[in-house]
């Protein structure tokens, strides 16, 4: 089966989302807490954890999770 560049982008986004969720849970934070700290909506955090987020939102969420060191 051939994979397109879009397929790999979708895969990378889903892996990144799963990692964001794992980090959040390891920090014992709720989606609402991350959203509040990142100045985004809880829905934005939820979507990011599903692999669907804008780069600016990902950066804000990573900052809220103290991952931009």
Per-region residue spans from a language model:
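Residue-level signal for the short linker/turn that defines the boundary of a DNA-recognition helix
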Residues: 18, 28-29, 53-56
């Amino acid at each position: 089966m051939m994979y397109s560049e879009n397929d790999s982008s979708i895969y990378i986004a889903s892996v990144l989302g799963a990692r964001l969720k794992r980090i959040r849970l390891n920090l014992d934070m709720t989606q609402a807490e991350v959203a509040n700290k990142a100045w985004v909506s809880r829905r934005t955090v939820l979507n990011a954890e599903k692999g669907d987020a804008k780069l600016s939102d990902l950066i804000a969420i990573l900052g809220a999770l103290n991952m931009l060191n």
